[in-house]
Every structure is written in structure tokens, then in C-alpha cells.
Amino acid sequence: MPTVIGFEGSANKLGIGIIRDGVVLSNPRHTYITPPGQGFMPRDTAKHHQEHAIDILRRALDEAQIRPQDIDCICYTKGPGMGAPLVAVAVVARTVAQLWKKPIIGVNHCIGHIEMGRLITGANNPTVLYVSGGNTQVIAYLQKRYRIFGETIDIAVGNCLDRFARVLKLSNDPSPGYNIEQMAKKGKKLIELPYTVKGMDVSFSGILSYIECMAHKLLSSEECTPEDLCFSLQETVFAMLVETTERAMAHCGSNEVLIVGGVGCNKRLQEMMDVMAKERGAKLYATDERFCIDNGAMIAQAGWEMFQTGSVTPLEQTTCTQRFRTDEVEVTWRD
């Protein structure tokens, strides 16, 4: 039963998790939170990760009640993600691997989400909707690859929500998307917004540009409230995601759908997806914020699967890449 530690830091969350044979032993994380109306810059985010890495590592070991010599493999996020934060965490992982004299594995961030979702929910072979601040993909497994059947052609859905939260000067604590979700619950009026679906692909830049331009006018004229705008944005973008996911399920003949990624925590998205799934006689699988949001355990779990099949990354190849597509990885651990 190998024990694997995973280091995640592709965006504003630093997480270190430990997995042993499918059991999460520890999974602490720390989030870099900026003032309302601001995003997070790569350099500042990397500095945050550097400052908190030792503390989070110590917490992970203490909570798991294990020692460095009990670890069999070190795993880190190779990509995709923001360059500076990725590198900052990779340096920590490489250093730990050399100090502890352990093998190291570079893990695809998206595959970490998928494998964690499968582990926690028990989903067997689902169509996967991966939605976060940096990614929006509809995925299914086929012939040793996680195939991308549909994706955003511009910005990610989480990026769309986060940027609109800045327009409204919403707090980034715990996350802008969460605060939009809470405001949307109070919205009563649905504002018509651009709806762009192209086959199984989606586009969010147009809807964001439109609502950014119209927000001041609509709010100053009291045609609607900020809550109405949050409600309208959520309903529109989530309807787009449900439509494309259903199309992929029909194409693959799937009776399971799994939502992963930070936006997957959204209860309204889960609710809308569940309605669609039940109408198709399918089942929805979703996780809570412990595992939907970026965390170290998901990197450990994907790395554990890879380690079991003999995958190890030579130290000189433990680089990072901001662009690392899901379908680039050969999935050796699945039939």
C-alpha cells in the first residue's frame, strides 16, 4: 500500500495532501485572497506559496501522523496553471524528493480532479464536466485517454464569474464564485444575456463583455439589482454547460455524469445537472468543497494511480507547463 504526497499550487490555492491506498490521510491548504475588485497576480501568488509551503507540509505530515520515511512517492502539479505559482510549488516538491530520497511524478492538474472525483464519489466511467477558474471541458474516457469532447473556445466559466464579481466589488473571501452564488439565491429577475453554444463547445467572453458593459446602466436605472445580475449570469452559463454535457453523454451513451473543479461546488449547477441526468435515467456525481476546489490530495491520488503502474518522472524532466492538455496523458491505470 504505497503512501503518496501531492503538492498543488497551480493557482491561488496551495495544497498538500497525503493518500494511502485510496484513503485521504490529510489534505490541508491555504488560499491567497486579494482585496475586493482585484484578481491575483502570478508573482504575488507564487510568493504566497513560497511563504506557506513549509507550514502546510508540516500540517499535512502531522495530520496524517506519518514521517517522511513513510512516504513512497512525491507528486506535484506539472500543469496546466499559472507559471510562477506552478514553478514555486514544483521547486518545493523537487527539494523534498531529493532530501527524502524519493521518486517524483509530475501530474496533470485536470486528471487530478477527475481521479479524485472518481475516488470520492465511486463513479465508474462518467462523462466529466471539469469547470474551474482556468478550465472548462467536457471529458470522457476512451482508449487510454481522457478525451475532450467539448471545451471553452475563449475563457473559462470560473474566470467569467470571477471577473464579474470584480465588477460588483464582491469579496474574494472565500472565493468570488461562492459570493456570486450566494447573491444569485436572492435574485428574482432573469435578464436576457448572450447564449453561445457551438456543438459541444462554449464561449463566455461575449456574455462577460455584455454584462460588464450593461451592469452600470441596469443598476443605475434600477432595472434590476446586483442579485438579479448574479442570478441571470449563473442561470445562463450553467444552462450552456448542462446542454453541452448532455450532448456528450448522448454521444458516448453514458449514464453517469461527474462534476469536478472549483465551480463544481456550486449547488445551483449541481441542481441543474441533476435534473438533466434524471431525465436521461442517469446519475449525477459531485463532491463538496473539500475535493472540488484545488487540493493536494487530488494530485496525490492521480500520482498514486500512476505510481502503481510504474510511472516515475526523471528529475531532469520535472518541469512545469502552463499548457498541458488533459488528452496528452496516457491513462495507463484504467482498462
Swiss-Prot record:
One of its GO terms (biological process) is tRNA threonylcarbamoyladenosine modification. Its main location: cytoplasm. Its cofactor is a divalent metal cation. Keywords: Acyltransferase, Cytoplasm, Metal-binding, Nucleus, Transferase, tRNA processing. It is found in: Cytoplasm; Nucleus. Substrate binds at residues 130-134, 162, 177, 181, 266. Disulfide bonds: none annotated. A divalent metal cation binds at residues 109, 113, 130, 294. Binds 1 divalent metal cation per subunit. It is an enzyme of class 2 (transferase). InterPro entries: ATPase_NBD (IPR043129), Gcp-like_dom (IPR000905), KAE1/TsaD (IPR017861), Kae1_archaea_euk (IPR034680), Peptidase_M22_CS (IPR017860). The keyword Cytoplasm applies. The keyword GTP-binding does not apply. GO terms for cellular component: cytoplasm; EKC/KEOPS complex; nucleus. One of its GO terms (molecular function) is N(6)-L-threonylcarbamoyladenine synthase activity. Its EC number is 2.3.1.234. PROSITE patterns: GLYCOPROTEASE. It catalyses: L-threonylcarbamoyladenylate + adenosine(37) in tRNA = N(6)-L-threonylcarbamoyladenosine(37) in tRNA + AMP + H(+). Belongs to the KAE1 / TsaD family. Component of the EKC/KEOPS complex; the whole complex dimerizes. This is Probable tRNA N6-adenosine threonylcarbamoyltransferase. It comes from Nematostella vectensis. The gene is osgep.
